Regions:
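Short coil/turn segments at beta-strand junctions that form active-site/ligand-binding loops
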Residues: 56, 115-117
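Conserved glycine-rich acetyl-CoA-binding loop
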Residues: 78, 87, 91-105, 113-114, ...
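C-terminal "cap" of GNAT-fold acetyltransferases
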Residues: 117-118, 124-131, 135-166
């Protein structure tokens, strides 16, 4: 059965939607994130709303069900990055249907107007599946592994992707 994927930018009034998908992600894939379910489950409405002040949150839905998420933060980053992408996750029930490709397509359509032309991200060095998925989207590894400040003993790899207009 074909899937209808819809990508939207969430706004602060949709903080519950962000919270719900983020907590699902932390329960499903705790190894993939710097944060923890235990800590983020304790955040109140004000703390969730504050996150919207510094980051743009994107959610992809499949036939009306929130199935993937990411955030984008504008910054002057390593290797010329104009933004940093993080918090990428897709629901295991919907993996393989093109959610990440759809969300990066959503970003690319706005890249010029929002200064998202050179996208950077960090991925744990032991997350081979995510690294391969990002490479399929055009990301390349840059620099060597970096020590995590949020999870001592873990290392992440920086990856960069330039959009067609960069």
């Amino acid at each position: 059965m074909p899937h209808t994927i819809t990508c939207v930018e969430l706004h602060a009034d949709e903080w519950v939607r962000l919270r719900d998908i983020r907590l699902r992600a932390l329960l499903d894939s705790p190894h993939a994130f710097g944060g923890t379910y235990e800590k983020e489950n304790q955040l109140d409405e004000q703390q969730w709303r504050l996150d919207f002040a510094k980051q743009t949150h994107i959610v992809a839905s499949v036939n009306g069900i929130d199935a993937a998420m990411m955030y984008v933060e504008n910054l002057e980053g390593d290797f010329g990055a104009t933004c940093w992408v993080g918090g990428c996750w897709s629901d295991p029930d919907f993996r393989g249907v093109g959610l990440m490709r759809a969300m990066f397509g959503f970003l690319d359509k706005q890249a010029e107007s929002r200064d998202w032309l050179v996208q950077g991200l960090g991925v744990w060095t032991d997350n081979d599946l995510a690294i391969a998925a990002y490479e399929k989207l055009g990301f390349i590894e840059m620099g060597g592994p970096q020590a995590s400040t949020r999870q001592p003993g873990k290392f992440y790899q920086r990856m960069i992707r330039k959009t067609a207009r960069a």
